[in-house]
Structures are given as structure tokens and as C-alpha cells.
Amino acid sequence: MEETNRQKKIGGLLQKDLADILQNSLRESGRTGILISVSKVRVTTDLSIAKAYVSIFPSKHQEEVIKEINENKSQIKHEMAQRTRHQLRKMPDLSFYVDDSLEYIDGIEKSIKGKEDPVANPDLLDKRKKS
């Protein structure tokens, strides 16, 4: 089912504020060299749950940063509620997921440029076919 305009507006608002909060919390905790971005926020139709997809670079820090975010979920929700108190009546519950789509794209790009290029090595196509 397609998202309504209200869901899209709330998702965009939450995405912008979440990115700001997460970047500030990383900076305040003294962690440097880690880049965090919120790539997408999807809100359920009843506006009670917001799923935030977070990209973390370098990817070796993904698990520990997501764990840290989930441990501090209540503080993040409180900060979000303070920022959006004039736009939202009720703050949705937040759930965070790792967005690994950029890693997936990077893997495809590396395989095309590397030894697994089907244009340069047409024998690979026969090996990839399912029997």
C-alpha cells in the first residue's frame, strides 16, 4: 500500500530531525571518524511507529552504533518530541534499522569492474544460470 501524504510529511520531518540528533550525539560522545545519516523514515498508517533506516560509515562500526542508538532510544524519542511538539500531536515509537543498500550497490559495482564482469567474461553467465 502506498504511503499517504501525511505519512510522507511526517517521515520527512522525522528524518531531518533524527539525522541532526544522531550526528550531535555522536559528536558529543567524542566519537570521530564516523558518519551517520538517516536515509529513510517510514511511518505506519496509524502513525504510531516510525522505522528509521540509518547508514553508518565506515561499516565496521554499524553494529555497535545501532546497539548504542537502540539503548538510547527513549532519550532520542524525548528529544524528537521536544523538537516536533508544534507539528505532531503524538510522537511515534522509533525503531532503527541498518540501511546497507549502499554497501550492496558498492558490491555490485566492484563485481562489475572486477573479475566477475559478464561483458568481459561471458562464461560467467552460463555458470550463473539456474538449472
Curated annotation (Swiss-Prot):
GO molecular function: ribosomal small subunit binding
Localization per record: Cytoplasm
InterPro entries in the cross-refs: KH_dom-like_a/b (IPR015946), RbfA (IPR000238), RbfA_dom_sf (IPR023799)
Record carries keyword Cytoplasm: yes
Tree of life domain: Bacteria
S-S bonds: none
SUPFAM superfamilies linked to this entry: Ribosome-binding factor A, RbfA (SSF89919)
Quaternary structure and interacting proteins, as annotated: Monomer. Binds 30S ribosomal subunits, but not 50S ribosomal subunits or 70S ribosomes.
Functional description taken from the UniProt entry: One of several proteins that assist in the late maturation steps of the functional core of the 30S ribosomal subunit. Associates with free 30S ribosomal subunits (but not with 30S subunits that are part of 70S ribosomes or polysomes). Required for efficient processing of 16S rRNA. May interact with the 5'-terminal helix region of 16S rRNA.
Name by which UniProt lists this protein: Ribosome-binding factor A
